[in-house]
């Protein structure tokens, strides 16, 4: 499985409005058609599988370009330039670099479709297809010496990774995680919930904490 991960601390996606805009601009039916099997379903928000301990149901991902446009405007990108890209008050286009492991052919396909869809919507995407070592150095706390530079990346995740640490895929999100932490979330409320999950003595206590994520 794979997910589009944003760097929440640096660059374009430190603004939640722009993360939301991308979420609503993507066409999930196309991903299902081109990359899914006959049994594929459009996932819910978040990337935690429903079979994961602590899973809480969320709304299904939907495509809504009008809502995406509202989020772009909320972020200060109110007009488009001659190339069709949203620009802010300074005339700077909404653009980001999407990092992907070039050795993972399917992941490259995901990245290319994201680029195609977002540029049709009005966000410029620069693909950064690199080898494994360069990819890890841009997306992992361990291999970057806590200097993650990616703006967004295609992340592969595993069942083992989903359950590590405090579970629920938190190692991929927690900016303080020693190995992963690509999403660079340092929010105090998020850290407090992770502490609650860690301290849980019963499954009921764990689910109570998980419901707050």
Where are the model-predicted features located?
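Extracellular/periplasmic solute-recognition and catalytic clefts
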Residues: 1-10, 33
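Short strand-loop junctions, especially beta-strand C-caps/beta-turns
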Residues: 7-11, 99-103, 130
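Short, hydrophobic alpha-helical packing/hinge segments within bilobed ligand-binding/sensory domains
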Residues: 9, 18-19, 31, 68, ...
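Append "and occasionally in soluble cytosolic enzymes with long acidic Gly/Pro-rich linkers
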Residues: 14-116, 212
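Extracytoplasmic/peripheral linker and loop segments enriched in polar/acidic and small residues
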Residues: 32, 125-136, 166-213
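Periplasmic binding protein-like
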Residues: 119-174
